[in-house]
Regions:
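Short beta-strand-centered aromatic/proline hotspots
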Residues: 56-67
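Short, basic/aromatic beta-hairpin or loop at an interaction surface
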Residues: 11-28
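Beta-sheet entry/capping signal
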Residues: 4, 45-48, 59
Length: 157
């Protein structure tokens, strides 16, 4: 059974939405309490990426379970071979605080200035790295409308 999840982009010194969007991943790390949740995502799960202070910026399907940043590849090439806006993603790459990256196929994504949000409308957001959207009907309907997608169809593919 595939899940539908909220995932916090968690921008900071180690990651940025632009890299996540361009290279097809979401990441978490710098302590196991942050990386552990993203490591529970399974192939086929659908995620809605949330960028704090902006709103929802993408909906994607997990294509592979999360791996340590040193092992993450795009088209067979290690991530470090690409020109990242946020190369600090490699901080602590060799210890338990490593970033873990889950690879995604972005179904729909937008840049930060076009993030989807409606104030005072009870849309789900959280400080958590990952949370289920299963009982967040209002947010699911908002995402379907704003990103012009149908979650039921995404799960039948």
């Amino acid at each position: 059974e595939k899940g539908m999840y909220y995932v916090n982009v968690g921008e900071g010194d180690n990651r940025c939405w632009e890299d996540c969007r361009e290279f097809g991943y979401l990441s978490a790390g710098q302590h196991p309490k942050y990386s552990d949740p993203i490591r529970t995502l399974e192939k086929g799960d659908v995620v809605a990426a949330y960028l704090k202070g902006h709103g929802y910026v993408g909906v994607g399907r997990v294509t592979n379970k999360a791996v340590r940043v040193n092992d993450f590849k795009i088209k067979g090439k290690l991530l470090g071979r690409y020109n990242l806006k946020m190369p600090n993603i490699y901080t602590n790459a060799n210890n338990e605080n490593s970033e873990f990256l889950v690879s995604l196929d972005w179904i729909k994504s937008v840049d930060r200035k076009n993030a989807k949000w409606k104030s005072k409308s009870n849309l789900f957001s959280s400080q958590l790295v990952k949370a289920s959207l299963e009982n967040q009907q209002k947010t699911v309907e908002f995402l379907e409308r704003e990103f012009e997608i149908n979650f039921k169809e995404l799960f039948s593919i």
